[in-house]
């Protein structure tokens, strides 16, 4: 359950 955090962080940073 770490991929979700990674994707979320990546998406948040990209914003």
Curated annotation (Swiss-Prot):
Keywords: Hemagglutinin, Lectin
Native species: Vigna unguiculata subsp. sesquipedalis
Function: Trypsin-stable lectin with hemagglutinating activity. Has mitogenic activity on murine splenocytes. Inhibits HIV-reverse transcriptase.
Organism ancestry: Eukaryota, Viridiplantae, Streptophyta, Embryophyta, Tracheophyta
Domain of life: Eukaryota
Protein name per UniProt: Lectin 29 kDa subunit
Similarity field: Belongs to the leguminous lectin family.
Known partners and oligomeric status: Heterodimer of a 29 kDa and a 31 kDa subunit.
GO molecular function: carbohydrate binding
Factors inducing expression: Hemagglutinating activity is inhibited by polygalacturonic acid.
């Amino acid at each position: 359950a770490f991929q979700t955090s990674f994707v979320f962080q990546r998406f948040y940073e990209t914003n």
